[in-house]
Amino acid sequence: MQDLGDAPEIHPSKIRVGDVIGATRPTHMRYTVKMISGPQTSPRRWTFFGSDADGRQQNDTFGEDDLVRRYAKAS
């Protein structure tokens, strides 16, 4: 898995189930995407649901102008 600064920043529409993601804002939270809701319209938003390495459930919502860090791509 990549370090925080090495992970590429990509558009939310490029995230797939199985990817390990985190926000571009300062955080060390990473989680594996289990389900994606979206895009919702006006404004376009994607909500990602998943679990972190400790098994805790996580979710984040990203907008059209946001970027997401992808630490590992789904195989």
Sequence positions of predicted segments:
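Mixed-charge, Lys/Arg-rich low-complexity intrinsically disordered regions
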Residues: 1-17
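Basic/aromatic-rich interaction segments and small domains that mediate binding to polyanionic partners
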Residues: 26-62
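Intrinsically disordered, low-complexity, charged/polar segments
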Residues: 2-4, 49-75
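Intrinsically disordered, low-complexity cationic segments
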Residues: 10, 27, 69-70
